[in-house]
């Protein structure tokens, strides 16, 4: 975390406030609405102000001219909730979407969300099929890294695709998707994977 974000300073407990879905934060003259958007994590919120949404991880990772990808991470990955959260963001009809990884999406927010939505399904189903086939976790990590890297390069106009892949791996390491998917399929849909793989350790 320090490599990515620098030193994280402690926040006094009396300055921490838990927000509920739909709660409005008054920062005069601004009113910012917190919207619960689980899927990446159960506590995740996006923040809506005027025609802008500060999307957090649920809105995907997108670097430069690369595509939006979903940061699948353990332990709280939940695919159905992720789709519901994307639908919530889409319904806001925002003109600007701000991503923590990284930057501002403007004028193509709907396209960004559609591409992210499609990739959530495609990646989760690819991982499910490999888990169902009893692929060992170490091999699955390697296979998924190759799959993701090929996906990043497909149709990309980036000339330095290796550099782009390195940047994506730094921001969102592909091995975390394997850990997140294993737990998700084992916990929520054990009937869709093999019996041998369907028990959480």
Predicted regions and their residues:
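Active-site/pore-lining binding-face segments in mid-to-C-terminal subdomains
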Residues: 80, 85-146
């Amino acid at each position: 975390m320090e490599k990515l974000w620098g030193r994280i300073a402690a926040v006094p407990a009396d300055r921490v406030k838990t927000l509920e879905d739909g709660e409005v934060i008054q920062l005069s003259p601004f009113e910012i609405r917190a919207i619960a958007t689980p899927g990446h994590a159960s506590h995740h919120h996006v923040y809506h102000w005027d025609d802008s949404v500060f999307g957090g991880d649920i809105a995907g990772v997108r670097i430069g001219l690369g595509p939006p990808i979903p940061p699948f991470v353990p332990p709280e990955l939940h695919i159905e909730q992720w789709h519901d959260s994307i639908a919530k963001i889409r319904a806001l009809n925002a003109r600007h979407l701000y991503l923590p990884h990284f930057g501002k999406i403007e004028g193509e927010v709907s396209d960004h969300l559609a591409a992210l939505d499609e990739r959530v399904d495609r990646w989760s189903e690819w991982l499910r099929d490999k888990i169902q086939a009893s692929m060992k976790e170490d091999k699955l990590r390697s296979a998924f890294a190759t799959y993701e890297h090929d996906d990043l390069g497909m149709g990309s106009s980036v000339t330095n695709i290796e550099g782009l892949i390195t940047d994506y791996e730094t921001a969102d390491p592909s091995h975390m998707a394997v850990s997140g998917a294993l737990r998700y399929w084992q916990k929520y849909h054990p009937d869709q994977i093999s019996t041998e793989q369907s028990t959480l350790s």
